[in-house]
Every structure is written in structure tokens, then in C-alpha cells.
Amino acid sequence: MAKVRTRFAPSPTGRMHVGNLRTALYEYLIAKHEGGDFILRIEDTDQERLVEGATEIIYRTIAKTGLIHDEGPDKDKGFGPYVQSERQATGIYLKYAKELVENGEAYYCFCTKERLETLKSAVGEEDGESKEITKYDKHCLHLSKEEVEANLAAGMPYVIRQNMPTEGTTSFTDAIYGTITVENSELDDMILIKSDGFPTYNFANVIDDHFMEITHVVRGNEYLSSTPKYTRLYKAFGWEEPVYIHCPLITNEEHQKLSKRSGHSSFEDLIEQGFVTEAIVNFIALLGWSSTTNEEIFSLEELVREFDYTHINKSPSVFDMNKLRWMNGEYIKRMDSEKYYEYALPQIKKVVTKDYDLKFIADLVKTRIETFLDIAEMIDFFDELPEYDIAMYTHKKMKTDSENSLKVLQDVLPRFEELTCYSVSSIESVLMGYIAENGIKNGQGLWPVRTAVSGKQSTPGGAYEIMSILGKEESLRRIRIAIDKLSSSL
């Protein structure tokens, strides 16, 4: 059996969409599961859509996610060039397009934009706008050899189109969807070489996949409709087709196609929203694939061992933000303290500017956050006591109200004034001693103090930890503010 070779072939048109990242991940996993090679190829044939700096984004993303390629523009192993514009300069695409013309499998088309406009027909709506398609009518197929040569000699702009049969059927096999057969009459004569001399995405893919000896091709199921055209190209050349693996659509929670407007459609969007790379990769692996085990948390190495592309689903995969947040939280909990602190510190510094123990604050929130952007809102009370309503002192479960909260604060204030060491254990000793002496429930003694020093309904850590971080002076100041608030309301 031939060595498994897969390729990730992105276009440098901006940030990497999660659908593209899933394709890269699946290509990587298929290759590595079988001990094969994972190739990076840059598809820049659509020159109008190129975005400056987008190639660097591709390199940065695959490096950060650990999807290290064995071959690519920076690692030529004899199958290069690995950038399509560089391959185009060698004349390879035009050479094979002309071979198809000679065999009657393709033809020159000289139709103007104006003529092509007349062939357009509406096919419904997409994103609120009417969608049109142009099905070519084979007009230029009927030009004589002399007419074609005269047009070429005159420098008339042209494209080269694939010549599809109008009768019969074409079948191909997909690893997920099985054998699919289409009527040839439904297939358009797609363009192979554009008027600028560049190949189309579809044609370049077939040529490059063949000469790079690609064995498995992963792509979104929106390409299922184009695959019969690829099949006919492979047959026309007498080449063996790769294994096709078409992945299900990724939708948002409303079951609509995940778009850039969602705000979390790209890898970089998710990083900016406080998600960690390992969690993103793990989550994206499960968008359409599931393990035979019930496990959901996988390292990249574990995914390589577990991944079996025959377990990819056909049905659309929902990008469930709640599940991603949960998974991210699990990864944060498992992070080693040094790496975690490196991620958490910039978020802590956004809201904590005073000389507090930031490492202690980071440790308090570690098991409570799902993304790093959750941190700021949880700890913003350290720098500045927020305005709060005294209704917060009334808590049915804790059996507290304004009156008994005021008494607790007035009673513990002198004890804290006398305390010199504001360690967690010292503060705990004072409060638990007071609770025991007065025969009250823990919540009755702790809730008023925590509320007073934080001004918040929920906090990372309790009264002991918060007061230890704030220190004596600030803790006492906040307790006195609370006493004044409660006294003036009664």
C-alpha cells in the first residue's frame, strides 16, 4: 500500500476559519495515524482575494496548533513548488489543460462577460440576497479549429473549459457518503484556466494532488457537487483518484452556516476571546467526529492514536459555545501553574493595579473560569470597592439580614483591628472563633464579612482569602464603610 500523504491547501485570504482548521486537523490526523506525510500547499490562484500577511497567519496557526507539516514551501522534499502561483509559472497547468483540449475533454472559450451575463439564472436566495448561477451553453465548443487558432493569434482573451458529456452519469465514492451518482446533464463546463492564465481552484487541485501523490483529500461537503467534475478529470488523464473524505457543515446554534459575523468563526477570534489552543483543537476535532470511547478530552497525541476517519458523521455539526467554554475550563484546570499564570497575568493586570499578591488572585480564579476573559469581571473589586445595595446582606440560606449582618461586622471589627498578621489562617481563626463563641451558623458570620470586603454577590475565594489579599488597612476600611451603610439604613 502506498504511503499515506495528505495535504492542507489553504488560500491566504485572511484569518483561518474553524472549518479550514478542522480540515487541516483531520488531514494531519489521517496522515499521522498511518505514519504518513502531512503537506502544506498554498493555493493563491485567486489573485484578487489575496490578503497581505495571510500566509504568515497560516504558518502561525498551524505552528501554534501543533499541526507541523512534513513538506511545504519551507520544506521542499522533491514535490515542489508548494505555492500554486510558483507552480503556475512553470506552465504545468496550461500544459495539462492543452492536453485535455487535444483529447476533446476541454475547449477554448472566447465568450465575453456580456454574453455570459445573458446565461445567468436565479436559483433562490442566500443570506437574504438572490443567488444566480451561470450554466454555460457550450457555444465555443462548436468553433472550428481554424476559428480557435485565429482567435488565439489575434490575442483574444480566453478561458479553457472542461467538456462535460450531456448524457449518461458520473459516479464517485466518498469515504463518508458512499457512492454518489449524478446525471452528466447537470454538470457545468467548468473553467480550468482563467483569462489571466491562472488555473481555477478546482483544476489546480487535481493537477497538484496527482503530482504530489496525495492519497487522501479532506474537504467540506459543499464540494460534493464539484467532485464528479474532478472524477472526470482524473479519468481523462488516466490517473488514480485519491480517497475522498467530505466533512459535514459546521453551523451555529441556530443551525445556520457559521459565518464571520458570528464573532467566533476563526482560530484567532477564539484566541482573542480567551480560549486556549489545546482546547480549540480538541473541540474542533469533535465537530463531526467522535471516538469509540466516551472520552471528550484528547491531547493532539491522543487524537492521532484515536482518529478513524470512517467515524466522521454526515449530519451538520453545531458549534456549541457552551461546550467549548466547558472544555476550555477543563484545560485551564489541568494547566501547570507556570503556564496558567502566564495566560492569567495580563487579564489580572487589566483590573488590578495595586500591589496585591497577583499569583494568589490567579490561583483563586483558576477552577472558576472557563476562558481567561472571565477573570477581569470576577476580580475587579480588589482595586476598587464597587457600589452595592445593602439588600445583598439579606440571604435566606445564610439566615442573614441587615440587622444581624450589622451586629456581626460591629463585633468582628475590633478583633480585626487588633490582628497584626493578615494571613488566611489568622483571619479564619478570628472569624471561626467568633462564630463558635456566639453559637451562630458559619454562613451567618462569613456572609456579611465577605459582602463587606467585596461588594459582590459571588467572588473567587471567601472572606479569609479576600481580606488576606487586601491587607489590614483596606479590609478595615471596607468593613467600616459597610457598618456605616447598614447603620444609616436601619
Curated annotation (Swiss-Prot):
Localization in the cell: Cytoplasm
Motif 'KMSKS' region per UniProt: ranges: 257-261
Family, similarity comment: Belongs to the class-I aminoacyl-tRNA synthetase family. Glutamate--tRNA ligase type 1 subfamily.
E.C. no: 6.1.1.17
Note on how the cofactor is bound: Binds 1 zinc ion per subunit.
Cellular component, GO annotation: cytosol
UniProt binding sites for ATP: K260
UniProt motif 'HIGH' region: location: 10-20
Subunit and partners: Monomer.
A Gene Ontology BP annotation from the UniProt entry: glutamyl-tRNA aminoacylation
Annotated InterPro entries: aa-tRNA-synth_I_cd-bd (IPR045462), aa-tRNA-synth_I_codon-bd_sub2 (IPR020751), aa-tRNA-synth_I_CS (IPR001412), aa_tRNA-synth_I_cd-bd_sf (IPR008925), Glu-tRNA-ligase_bac/mito (IPR004527), Glu/Gln-tRNA-synth (IPR000924), Glu/Gln-tRNA-synth_Ib_cat-dom (IPR020058), GluQ/Sye (IPR049940)
PROSITE patterns associated with the record: AA_TRNA_LIGASE_I
Protein name: Glutamate--tRNA ligase
One Pfam family per UniProt: Anticodon_2
Keyword Iron: no
Keyword set, alphabetical order: Aminoacyl-tRNA synthetase, ATP-binding, Cytoplasm, Ligase, Metal-binding, Nucleotide-binding, Protein biosynthesis, Zinc
The organism of origin for this protein: Lachnoclostridium phytofermentans (strain ATCC 700394 / DSM 18823 / ISDg)
Domain of life (superkingdom): Bacteria
